[in-house]
């Protein structure tokens, strides 16, 4: 690497004892221009999660009507060797990561549909025009479901259930993998859902009317320890409106609690045109950790104090990364890529020329601050 005015130092190798995830995508009828932002979204998840087993994904481009941007179907396994919780369904991407081996040979780990009729923005810069939906954001959201931000809730009449979903509930959409017999067992995500008065959903009669009432109470919480820690000690709100919506209820963060502009907005049920979010957010990452995922060591879960946060712009960056380091003393900054290589600079930091770095996900650390900022290089 040639010398620069900001004194970039030679790259060295950092050794981590973990392997970030690899997401292998098969595209079905997806136009080439749409494959770029979908792959970009996958690279974000790859930089976050740790797994020795490649994650196999099928993406299908098909008309889904006017109200739906995407639909995800995770494959599942339960009671596998090393399963942390028995009698519980795990998405196979997570089950494979926990088992350290592929449990579903010849099958996809999850499949998702994207609406071919929607007006999509195919860029990866987050500059989504009014009237268009950001495909990176939606693909990132759907992959979040496939990786485990998903449950097995259903309500018919007054009766709610966990683990009674049928493939016919989602007709005419189908999956290439065999639909498992769920046997009235909850998913690992469901194990953390609770009503403030009636307790955890998996303690309720299943199927049952008390369970059904909780599912439409607008009061559901996620009671995982990491999620609570990332939410200031409070259980995050889960979307549970008074009218049950299959595929939306009980499998998203609450829309009104985490509206557009909130760092946790990605995994809420609704998306707006003209907006973009290319990061899962601290609550989603904490929930992933609660259900069993190992998060890469350079990924921070909690939000930093807004008045003392390190800032970077633009993000994604093409060549020049501008830094805001709101600390009076000079510090060392380290940029680490997904391969473990680091570029160091010292002194007062204003900007770094990254034009020679390959595209991908990176993390910026500033010595002595305890902060990590993620950014994408195009």
Where are these regions (language model features)?
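C-terminal tail/sorting-segment detector
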Residues: 3, 359-378
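Extracellular zinc-dependent metalloprotease catalytic-domain scaffold
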Residues: 20-140, 146-297
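Short beta-strand/loop motifs in extracellular/secreted proteins, especially
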Residues: 53-55, 329-333
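Short proline/glycine-enriched turn/loop motifs at strand-loop junctions of beta-rich domains
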Residues: 326-331, 369
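Short, glycine-anchored, charge-dense loop/turn motifs used at functional sites
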Residues: 335-343, 362
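Glycine-centered tight-turn motifs at strand-turn-strand junctions
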Residues: 342-358, 371-372
